[in-house]
């Protein structure tokens, strides 16, 4: 089609129909549910060309996703079109950008924060573990529309807190919220900078500036309810493009009943062979939409089944089930003389995860309190290695890592891993499948743990894994390595019961 700016845009029939409907109804809200590879970013650029210059506010979750989006949509309203969620919140609050962690005074640490708030621990959790629990409470609160903290913001505990302990955690969390509000320089250190800024803007009653007529959000499955609350206060038309199957954990923020909806299932990136892998996942999920995924007939992604012991080729992106799985693959690849490197954003996080695991396994040699920035949030509910074992006893990658720790793997070994040193050459990248949404890579490998044959806890855990596998499969542009057929994997789990029943 030729856009109002006299530019030629090549569109699929489904995209063309949606754009024509949009142009005829510019004052109507719209939500597009589009599977991976349907060209959502390209479509978004076309929609923006139908609006007056400067009238569209484009939002994306992270700077990485915004940069990728800018490259895909082209020069629609300038090369710097759009804002990240945190940049938008800063604009509304008229706040300067919080200082990066490496620019903060050196005396700032989570230990110092715990002491400042006089957090002394809850139940058998030490000071730093209790602080991490409070941070999880604040994360849940910041994502919500709620105005006050309550027990519904508590994270899941394998052993539920007593009512007294729950009140103590909420009181600590309330104190932490008040302290962070007065000291925004801490935002980056506690790793909640974007959500804290958005929640502050929401609680302050902020609205989208009136100069914007439309708000467009890419990857809207990342949209927190608190940000939706801000947008809904204004009079702008809201256009969201997302994929519910790329929201593995947490709730997908739904739009109101009066919102025009459109589904696009035809993928311009993936072929029929990927279609045969993705549709069994869609059909098996217990609650999400069942519109079949349709691969392009003129596109072909090579799907390869790899044997046990296979090493991914140079430049491949390994998508793992968990941080335990990432740790396992990094150690295995290092033993083979290869570097498996976490993404830049994940490297510090994974190193902290590994250091915390080692410290809990060897408390006579290491202390979690000596870890810079404190123990990893994944361990906030554990005060001993036995508790870690109990929570992960069905995770094969965890059992493999535990065996390595029993053989003597320590912090010095961790620091010498090629993947943690950032060595390049014949290296590959590793990341968690759930965190790869919205990205695309030339060559992708799914780990065996991602397609585990062990029983899942319940239907909810299986649903979450189905979404993670969907994300992983749909990231590949040219070649995809899988350990076995996805339809057979689904059939295997259909033939066995879950470990537990969900619900009442």
Question: How should these model regions be labeled?
Answer:
Residues 1-504:
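The feature marks helicase ATPase cores and/or their adjacent C-terminal helical subdomains
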């Amino acid at each position: 089609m030729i856009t109002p700016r006299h530019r030629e845009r090549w569109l699929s029939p489904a995209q063309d129909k949606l754009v024509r409907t949009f142009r005829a109804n510019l004052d109507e809200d719209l939500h597009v549910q589009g599977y991976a590879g349907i060209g959502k970013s390209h479509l978004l650029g076309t929609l923006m060309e139908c609006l007056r210059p400067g009238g569209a506010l484009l939002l994306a979750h992270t700077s990485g996703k915004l940069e990728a989006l800018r490259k895909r949509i082209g020069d629609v309203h300038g090369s710097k079109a759009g804002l990240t969620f945190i940049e938008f919140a800063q604009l509304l609050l008229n706040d300067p950008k919080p200082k990066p962690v490496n620019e903060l005074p050196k005396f700032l640490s989570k230990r110092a924060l715990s002491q400042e708030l006089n957090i002394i621990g809850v139940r058998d959790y030490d000071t730093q573990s209790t602080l991490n629990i409070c941070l999880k409470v604040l994360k849940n609160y910041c994502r919500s529309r709620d105005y006050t903290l309550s027990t519904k913001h508590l994270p899941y505990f394998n052993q539920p807190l007593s009512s007294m302990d729950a009140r103590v955690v909420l009181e600590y969390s309330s104190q932490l919220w008040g302290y962070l509000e007065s000291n925004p320089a801490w935002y980056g250190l506690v790793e909640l900078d974007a959500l804290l800024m958005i929640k502050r803007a929401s609680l302050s009653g902020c609205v989208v500036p009136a100069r914007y007529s439309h708000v467009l959000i890419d990857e809207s499955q990342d949209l927190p309810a608190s940000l939706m609350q801000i947008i809904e206060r204004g009079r702008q038309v809201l256009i969201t493009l997302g994929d519910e199957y790329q929201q593995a954990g947490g709730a997908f923020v739904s739009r109101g009943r009066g919102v025009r909806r459109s589904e696009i299932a035809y993928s311009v990136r993936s072929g029929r062979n990927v279609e045969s892998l993705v549709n069994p996942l869609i059909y098996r999920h217990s609650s999400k939409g069942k519109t079949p995924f349709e691969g392009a007939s003129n596109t072909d992604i090579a799907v390869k089944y790899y044997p046990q012991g296979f090493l991914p080729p140079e430049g491949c992106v390994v998508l793992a089930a968990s941080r335990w799985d990432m740790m396992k693959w990094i150690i295995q690849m290092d033993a083979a003389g290869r570097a498996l490197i976490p993404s830049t954003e994940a490297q510090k996080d994974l190193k902290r995860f590994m250091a915390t695991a080692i410290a809990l396994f060897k408390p006579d040699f290491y202390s979690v309190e000596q870890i810079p920035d404190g123990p990893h949030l994944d361990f906030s509910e554990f005060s001993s290695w036995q508790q870690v074992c109990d929570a992960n006893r069905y995770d094969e990658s965890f059992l493999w890592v535990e065996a390595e720790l029993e053989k003597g793997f320590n912090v010095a070994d961790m620091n010498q891993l090629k993947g943690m040193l950032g060595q390049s050459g014949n290296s590959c990248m590793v990341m968690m499948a759930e965190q790869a949404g919205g990205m695309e890579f030339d060559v992708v490998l799914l780990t065996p743990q991602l397609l585990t044959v062990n029983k899942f806890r319940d239907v909810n855990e299986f649903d979450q894994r189905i979404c993670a596998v969907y994300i992983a499969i749909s990231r590949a542009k040219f070649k995809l390595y899988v350990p076995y057929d996805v339809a057979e994997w689904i059939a295997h789990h259909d033939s066995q019961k879950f470990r537990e029943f969900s619900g009442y």
